[in-house]
């Protein structure tokens, strides 16, 4: 195979010993059936790291994300992972597990931010009282705990579905986890910064990284907007269209359906509305 193209945001490419590359091998079919996965050793002729960028707030030792140019990169047939045209399936198998792992890590980060918020609220005395005694701060803590508990239970439920029925059965729940990971990190991170004041914005505290981590979670492994669209489509597949004029829960419609099912027995119900 000869591979040509460019790929941005190849994570850890600057230190990798091999690259996982998904490339179109059959352009005449839809992408999900025309992509194949290759394992390409670093240093292969034609594989060039053109630039490496780092996320804002990343640590000095992090390898960053690179722009790669593939210029007539020749690889043997044995470099293909799996069968031709199955690259999308391999990619999706990795992404499903990766997304719930993102959620698990985000849970721990959000819990730490909430702990920091609570410690600061119980410790900082200003304007005649502790922060913990001020109603707006109490609302911050209550809202954060509520969001975190919902997120935690959603992740646990998704993990149970995966363990019990497999990843395919948990597709909707994995999507929910991915959406919540971003929103919960951002909201709890922002509140934690507010409770810590200007100190929370300094490099001496990890809270800006919590907030930026929430932003990153809204982009990593697919943007939040794409996950919401896909989630809605999967959810709506379980529902059928009704009469476009009258919803099924409209009272007259329900009475007609009940009469069709139970007949004259409904006449003995005095509270039943009469049309």
Task: Name each model-derived stretch.
Residues 72-89:
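Long, acidic (Asp/Glu-rich), low-complexity accessory segments flanking structured domains
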């Amino acid at each position: 195979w000869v591979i040509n193209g460019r790929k941005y945001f190849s994570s850890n490419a600057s230190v990798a010993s091999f690259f996982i590359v998904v490339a179109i091998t059959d352009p005449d079919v839809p992408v999900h059936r025309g992509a194949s996965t290759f394992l390409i050793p670093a240093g292969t002729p034609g594989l060039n790291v053109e630039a490496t960028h780092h996320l804002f707030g990343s640590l000095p030792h992090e390898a960053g994300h690179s722009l790669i140019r593939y210029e007539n990169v020749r690889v043997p047939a044995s470099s293909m992972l799996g069968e031709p045209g199955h690259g999308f399936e391999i990619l999706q198998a990795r992404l499903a597990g990766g997304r719930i792992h993102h959620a698990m890590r985000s849970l721990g980060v959000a819990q730490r931010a909430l702990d920091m918020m609570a410690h600061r609220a119980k410790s900082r005395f200003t304007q005649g009282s502790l922060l913990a005694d001020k109603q707006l701060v109490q609302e911050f803590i209550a809202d954060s705990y509520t969001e975190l508990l919902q997120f935690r239970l959603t992740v646990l439920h998704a993990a149970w579905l995966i363990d019990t029925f497999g990843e395919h059965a948990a597709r909707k729940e994995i999507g929910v986890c991915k959406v919540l990971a971003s929103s919960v990190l951002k909201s709890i991170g922002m509140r934690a910064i507010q409770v810590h004041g200007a100190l929370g914005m300094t490099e001496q505290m990890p809270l800006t990284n919590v907030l930026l981590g929430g932003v990153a979670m809204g982009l990593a492994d697919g943007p939040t907007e794409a996950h919401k669209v896909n989630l809605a489509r999967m959810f709506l597949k379980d529902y059928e269209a009704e009469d476009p004029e009258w919803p099924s829960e409209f009272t007259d419609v329900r009475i007609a359906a009940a009469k069709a099912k139970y007949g004259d027995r409904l006449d003995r119900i005095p509270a039943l509305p009469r049309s």
